Structures are given as structure tokens and as C-alpha cells.
């Protein structure tokens, strides 16, 4: 009888965790679509490149739910945002998708070994290096146009967004993990 009760409790716990995971991933995807729009309305058309609002939802998902969730948030945010708002532009969409998926994977992996701040800093640095490699390959190996996308320029323009990420993302993820009683996947 005790074994049946323990199995029932385990099933309930797994079910609750799965629901939190699905709902959390969905909400962060919606935030990944809405937040860039809010920034564009408040701060103008260059707000996305400056404040990196779409990155925020992906990074929070990685620290809260792990690699799978953050990759889903990255893909769904980019594609749905484009379909609903036309942002990012179609020319920029594949590069931004690759960039956000790189961040999702790196942060999800690093967060299993290091604290959230170290993980986030390492992700931002290594993510930019890998993104530079993607752009290099797109230009020099595959011959794709990059439409003036520059890693160095994106870092300079995105410094306010990087500061926001470092200041807010680990705190928000910590609060979510505590409130939801989750460990990432």
C-alpha cells in the first residue's frame, strides 16, 4: 500500500512539473514575442538591437527550465514575432534564430555546472564568438548575404541590453525557480 502511495505522489509531482514546464515555456514564448514590440513602441525602431528584448525570454527559459525549453522559446519567439509583426526582418530572421538557439543551448549547459551569473557571462561571450563564426561561414563559405550584420557593431549597440540581461535575468530566473519549485531539465 505504501509503495502505491509513493508511486502516486511521484506521478503527481512529475505531472505538476510537466504542467509548470509547458505553461512556463509558453508564457516565456509569448513574452519573447511581446517584449520586443513593447520596446519598439517605447524606444523606437532600433530598440531591439539596443536592448535585446527577445534574448531576455530565451535566457530566463534556459536558467529556469533548461535547454529544451529555451530552444523552444527561441524558435517560437522568432518565427511568431516575424509572422505577427514582421520583426525581425526576413533577411535578419535566420541569423537571429541561430544566435538565440546558440544562447539557449550554451546557457542551459553552463547552468548545470556553474552559477547563473558565471553561466550568463560565459554564454554572452562564447555566444558572440560562435555567432561570429556563423556569420563568417555564411559570408565566406556558403556565400550568403548578411545584410551588414556585424558582430562587433551588434556588441557595441547591444551593451545596454547586455547590462539589462546581467542585472535582471539571473534574478528573475531565481525567483521563478523558487516560486515554481523547479530544477531545470
Language-model segment annotations:
Residues 2-63, 68-69, 103-111, 169, 173:
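Hydrophobic transmembrane alpha-helices
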Residues 6, 40-48, 86-94, 113-185:
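Membrane-embedded alpha-helical hairpins and interfacial helices in multi-pass inner-membrane proteins
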Residues 19-28, 50, 54, 68-73, ...:
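Alpha-helical transmembrane segments of integral membrane proteins
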Residues 32, 36, 40, 62, ...:
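Structural signal for membrane-spanning alpha-helices in multi-pass inner-membrane proteins
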Residues 55-59, 96-104, 166:
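Alpha-helical transmembrane segments of multi-pass membrane proteins
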Residues 64-65, 159:
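Transmembrane helix irregularities
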Residues 72-112:
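Helix-adjacent hinge/juxtasegments
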Amino acid at each position: 500500500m505504501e509503495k502505491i502511495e509513493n508511486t502516486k505522489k511521484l506521478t503527481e509531482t512529475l505531472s505538476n512539473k510537466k504542467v509548470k514546464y509547458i505553461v512556463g515555456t509558453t508564457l516565456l514564448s509569448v513574452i519573447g514575442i511581446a517584449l520586443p514590440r513593447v520596446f519598439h513602441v517605447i524606444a523606437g525602431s532600433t530598440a531591439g538591437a539596443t536592448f535585446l528584448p527577445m534574448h531576455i525570454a530565451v535566457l530566463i527559459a534556459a536558467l529556469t527550465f533548461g535547454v529544451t525549453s529555451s530552444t523552444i522559446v527561441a524558435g517560437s519567439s522568432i518565427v511568431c514575432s516575424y509572422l505577427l509583426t514582421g520583426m525581425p526582418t526576413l533577411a535578419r530572421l535566420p541569423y537571429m534564430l541561430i544566435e538565440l538557439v546558440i544562447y539557449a543551448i550554451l546557457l542551459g549547459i553552463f547552468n548545470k555546472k556553474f552559477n547563473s551569473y558565471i553561466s550568463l557571462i560565459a554564454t554572452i561571450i562564447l555566444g558572440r564568438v560562435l555567432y561570429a563564426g556563423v556569420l563568417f561561414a555564411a559570408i565566406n563559405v556558403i556565400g550568403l548575404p548578411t545584410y551588414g550584420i556585424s558582430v562587433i557593431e551588434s556588441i557595441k549597440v547591444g551593451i545596454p541590453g547586455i547590462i539589462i540581461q546581467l542585472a535582471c535575468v539571473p534574478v528573475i530566473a531565481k525567483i521563478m525557480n523558487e516560486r515554481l519549485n523547479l530544477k531545470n531539465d
